[in-house]
Amino acid sequence: MARGPKKHLKRLAAPKAWMLDKLGGVFAPRPSTGPHKLRESLPLLIFLRNRLKYALNGAEVTKIVMQRLVKVDGKVRTDPTYPAGYMDVITLEKTGEFFRLVYDVKGRFVIHRISAEEAKYKLCKVKKTQLGAKGVPFLVTHDGRTIRYPDPLIHANDSVQVDIASGKITDYIKFDSGNLCMITGGRNLGRVGTVVNRERHPGSFDIVHIKDSQGHVFATRLTNVFIIGKGNKPYISLPKGKGVKLSIAEERDKRLAAKTH
């Protein structure tokens, strides 16, 4: 009989995107509850130990975070299993490094270094807008923020640029055809392209057709589309490969070309 929340996560049940080896133990760090879903997050422990190699084991990560050296979205986080997720800015002030968590085309969180200037803001997808107590309008974002008194032109599925220090909206991007977007779920996870059109299916899932910079067209659900730029101009820097998914043959040719040079 299950009593209360689960406290463990087996290695084999952990998200593939964490890229943990099967034989490295029985368990994986179970992310704490937080602004991102368990399967769409990356615990700080894996980020510092497995990705950045700043620690050899979990105990060392705990020592690092307990020195209050790690900030996520401008707030010090001392929980080694804090779930950092898509678009979060991780700051290590001691080394002067800034990272933004974004997906690569294989659907994994990529360690994407950014400048101090870019680390001052993040993009958030608007989940819903509504009226709160006393008729105060507010919107809810994909990372659990509630922002009051937004611009009345902002609606669900748009993206807002949030200043991390103040939590205020500095700019917004409408969900429109021709705008740049990144896919945050499904088999096209991590791909970047421009919105071609949106098929409305009342009572079901709206389908969005997207075209990448190579001219490939693919479709996904509206819930997986995250607007990241106006026209072809992204508001954030993109990781290596610019979100273009190569076919298996193209990947092979690229590898062979790299070997011959």
From Swiss-Prot:
GO terms for molecular function: RNA binding; rRNA binding; structural constituent of ribosome. Disulfide bonds: none annotated. Keywords: Ribonucleoprotein, Ribosomal protein, RNA-binding, rRNA-binding. One of its GO terms (cellular component) is cytosolic small ribosomal subunit. It comes from the Eukaryota. HAMAP family: Ribosomal_eS4 (MF_00485). This is Small ribosomal subunit protein eS4. The gene is RpS4.
